[in-house]
Amino acid sequence: MKLQLCAVGRLRSGPERDLVEDYLGRFERTGRPLGLPAVQLLEVEDRKGGGMEAEADLLARAMAPGAVLAILDERGRTLSSPEFAEQLARWRDAGRDVALAIGGADGLAPRLRDRADLALSFGRMVWPHMLVRVMLAEQLYRAATILAGSPYHRV
């Protein structure tokens, strides 16, 4: 299983980057004994100004061939943290590669949204794509702690 976080734009040094690195490090330490691989953070940039379509091409090229595509989109499904953990465990148990895709400031191109196996939402509000990375990294860590039976996730 490969687990990729594919995102448009590069995080500069600062609090968002620090948080993403912290949560992905925690995920790796917690997830490894559970058979979950370290997350590969793949950042793409459209330097030619081609917009969402060009970003979709770059994201598609970054993803592992045949990977389950899970996108972050405000029109997607809202899962609880335990439901997300269960989904992650199903992908792991099936040996599936997973690409979690976050679009740029304008979102994801319709053709990428249409081919997604799962569209996830952090609610009906629109979030800055840099914060979505932080939130997704935290939810990955939270999912690993749920699967490990750790007290981090309290209800």
From Swiss-Prot:
S-adenosyl-L-methionine binds at I71, G103, F122, G123, R124, M125, V126, W127. Its EC number is 2.1.1.177. One of its GO terms (molecular function) is rRNA (pseudouridine-N3-)-methyltransferase activity. Its main location: cytoplasm. One of its GO terms (cellular component) is cytoplasm. It holds the Pfam family SPOUT_MTase. InterPro entries: Alpha/beta_knot_MTases, RlmH-like, tRNA_m1G_MTases_N. It is an enzyme of class 2 (transferase). Specifically methylates the pseudouridine at position 1915 (m3Psi1915) in 23S rRNA. Homodimer. This is Ribosomal RNA large subunit methyltransferase H. It comes from Cereibacter sphaeroides (strain ATCC 17025 / ATH 2.4.3). The gene is rlmH.
